[in-house]
């Protein structure tokens, strides 16, 4: 941990029993493992109130929930490709940049909680009409891109505990 400094990795793998103590600045991920993960966490991620930025323009996946009970603090996904996630908790904010899509890796069992704000500036966030995930947000701000609300044909739902603002994007509901 280099407090307040920035760190850049091709990918981040935390093995079972291992710990990554993140900087309180920004940890940038620019590639993925041979297994297709920009982050593959089977251990403990200590966020130190820092930001993780995915800056990779090829489809990849995020496995950010390890065994330590703490997920990411801030996450920025800046990608022109699809980024998939498993069940995840973002302790503060999730920002979506780039023309790509961020979505759960399957139609069921991948719930997302963003305790702060989902800020969608470009690209798309969400899944299709058969989605059975529950996505929970403190707030949502759509400045651009497309927010695909969970629900419709599946049993999934989108929960917003605070404010929901669309100031320049598209909202799609299935």
What does each of the following model-derived ranges do?
Residues 1-89, 95-174:
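Extracellular beta-strand-rich, repetitive "passenger/adhesive" scaffolds
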């Amino acid at each position: 941990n280099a407090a307040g400094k920035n760190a850049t990795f091709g990918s981040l793998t935390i093995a079972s029993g291992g710990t990554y103590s993140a900087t309180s600045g920004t940890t940038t991920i620019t590639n993925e493992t041979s297994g297709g993960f920009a982050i593959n966490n089977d251990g403990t991620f200590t966020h130190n109130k820092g930001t993780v930025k995915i800056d990779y323009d090829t489809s990849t996946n995020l496995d950010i929930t390890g065994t330590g009970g703490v997920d990411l603090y801030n996450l920025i996904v800046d990608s022109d490709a699809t980024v998939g996630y498993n069940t995840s908790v973002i302790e503060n904010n999730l920002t979506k940049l780039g023309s790509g899509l961020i979505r759960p890796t399957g139609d069921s069992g991948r719930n997302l909680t963003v305790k702060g704000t989902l800020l969608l500036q470009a690209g798309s966030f969400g899944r299709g009409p058969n989605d059975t995930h529950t996505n929970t947000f403190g707030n949502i701000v759509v400045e651009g891109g497309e927010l695909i609300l969970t629900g419709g044909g599946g049993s999934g739902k989108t929960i917003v505990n605070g404010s929901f603002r669309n100031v320049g994007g598209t909202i799609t509901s299935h």
